[in-house]
Regions:
Chain A
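A short, ordered amphipathic alpha-helix with a cationic face
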Residues: 18-24, 55-58, 66-67, 78-80
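Helix-rich interaction surfaces within compact, conserved domain-sized segments
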Residues: 13, 65-105
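Generic, ordered loop/turn and secondary-structure boundary motif
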Residues: 7, 12-14, 20, 43, ...
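N-terminal first-folded block
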Residues: 4-36
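Metallocofactor- and cofactor-centric catalytic cores in central/energy metabolism, strongly enriched
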Residues: 30, 35-54, 58-59, 66, ...
Length: 105, 160
């Protein structure tokens, strides 16, 4: 655990930079985290995926893996990898301020 | 969980799938898909009987080996009864489906969509008389072992 400043607010993050408390999140933090991970600008499409991840997590208590993200988010797996080349489910969860999806698939 | 933050993170893996059974193919697919999900570059290389997983006629019909497979805990002579492999495969496939794992064809399509490279082995293709047309569209090429090593340069190689 470490404290870091994201979009002007001090938040607690884990070793991989995921927010510890999802309720501290806002969209400016998503943009700041994306920049750190090499995505300079979050487009509407990025935000669609990020908000979808966040809503799923809030509704179900866990974030979808890449397979169900491809099936249910309205964005195909191919496109997801174009949007988030370094791992769509992982990065979209991170930018959404929720825990990393758990599971092997 | 033990974490070693000092170690250099893995940035690329090349995974060889050489077995032609259901249980021989899944681990390599899970590792390739998992690598891409972590942002790690991945190549899949199908060789020998592993090529069935990317063969148009066989990829939907991969079976669990019921003979010579002590992990299954079925005596070899029982495992050899005709139809046993299909039965065990059906049981395992239904379990796999319940866990919401993709089937082998869906998994290979998915891995291809993640941007991983999928290749088949030239020596094996020659041995079985397969051409590119016999293999599913996700296979980008039939390559030599030398080309495989060139492609794998700078990453880890995993043989399954």
């Amino acid at each position: 655990m470490a404290t870091k400043s994201l979009a002007g607010q001090d938040v607690e993050v884990d070793a991989e930079g995921f927010l510890v408390d999802a309720s501290q999140w806002n969209e400016d933090m998503a943009r700041a985290m994306a920049k750190e991970d090499g995505i300079d600008e979050l487009t509407d499409k990025h935000m669609q995926v990020i908000n979808f991840m966040r809503n799923e997590y809030m509704a179900k208590g866990s974030a979808p893996n890449i397979r169900s993200l491809g099936k249910t988010s309205g964005v195909s797996i191919k496109e997801l990898y174009q949007l988030f080349p370094k791992g769509p489910a992982k990065l979209a969860a991170k930018f959404a301020g929720i825990p990393k999806p758990h599971g092997c698939i | 969980m033990t974490e070693n933050n000092e170690a250099e993170p893995i940035s690329k893996v090349s995974i060889v799938i050489s077995k032609g059974s259901l249980e021989g193919v899944y681990p390599g697919l899970i590792m390739a898909n998992g690598a891409r999900a972590e942002g790690i570059d991945a190549n899949l290389f199908f060789t020998f009987f592993g090529m069935d997983a990317v063969h148009k006629k066989h990829w939907k019909n991969m079976k669990v080996a019921t003979v010579g497979n002590p992990g299954l805990h079925i005596p070899t002579l029982i495992g050899a009864i005709p139809g046993m492999s299909s039965l065990v495969t059906r049981m395992m496939s239904s379990k796999i489906e319940k866990l919401d794992f993709p089937s082998i064809p869906e998994f290979i399509e998915m891995i291809s969509d993640t941007g991983a490279g999928i290749y088949a082995c030239l020596a094996s293709a020659d041995l079985f008389g397969y051409t590119k047309d016999d293999l599913v569209d996700q296979v980008e090429g039939i390559i030599t072992v030398g080309e495989f090593y060139t492609m794998a340069a700078g990453g880890q190689i995993i043989f399954t």
